[in-house]
Amino acid sequence: MLRKPIIAGNWKMNKNPQEAKAFVEAVASKLPSTDLVDVAVAAPAVDLVTTIEAAKDSVLKVAAQNCYFENTGAFTGETSPKVLAEMGADYVVIGHSERRDYFHETDEDINKKAKAIFANGLTPIVCCGESLETYEAGKAVEFVGAQVSAALAGLSAEQVASLVLAYEPIWAIGTGKSATQDDAQNMCKAVRDVVAADFGQEVADKVRVQYGGSVKPENVKDYMACPDVDGALVGGASLEADSFLALLDFLN
């Protein structure tokens, strides 16, 4: 089953609107055809309007980095998935380890968000990943499998087939440590196996699984050569236009 790769940059809490616009203008005309790869950037909420506007005539897709699971209401400081859709966003990243860790998001929250994102016609990029402690204890597969099952509970097979799963070992995010090619393949396959167990092999063959965690132009080819790695969710290397474009060289 040929799955189209997806490379997504996660800017985290970086860039003001002017910097976001300059970045999009620098990369937009240089991106490969959408027949080959989907390319997205996840911009901070304060940059979304500018980023979406700057990207609108290009193949670059735009993701929000989070949303709430209600469309409107007394939820001070939250972002409405309905409004994200109206603004023209394509994806929403949910379940990132920084959200789970610093903002105490639970698997149940992430599941509710996934449902709300689909209800508004957007596509979730659902993150999962284990700590160094869990990894060293040999419990990564079990831990990440439980995260994935919980995040996808109650979604339809069609929804699951269309979403993106991003496996990011927490010990490799922004640490300069990256998972080996074997680690990435084994864990992305484990994620796909959970989808197969919960939704059937046909759905598992369609769902795209990204690897994230210190991905850079120098190692992206190795990860993309893995049969179960369909893309990358990239932090630091997505902040500069040149390094972001260099991530796409794996196509050559």
Curated annotation (Swiss-Prot):
Keyword Protease recorded: no
Protein name (database record): Triosephosphate isomerase
CDD domains: TIM
NCBIfam families the UniProt entry points to: tim (TIGR00419)
Enzyme class: isomerase
Organism: Streptococcus pyogenes serotype M4 (strain MGAS10750)
GO molecular function per UniProt: triose-phosphate isomerase activity
Pfam family, one: TIM
Family under the similarity heading: Belongs to the triosephosphate isomerase family.
Function, in words: Involved in the gluconeogenesis. Catalyzes stereospecifically the conversion of dihydroxyacetone phosphate (DHAP) to D-glyceraldehyde-3-phosphate (G3P).
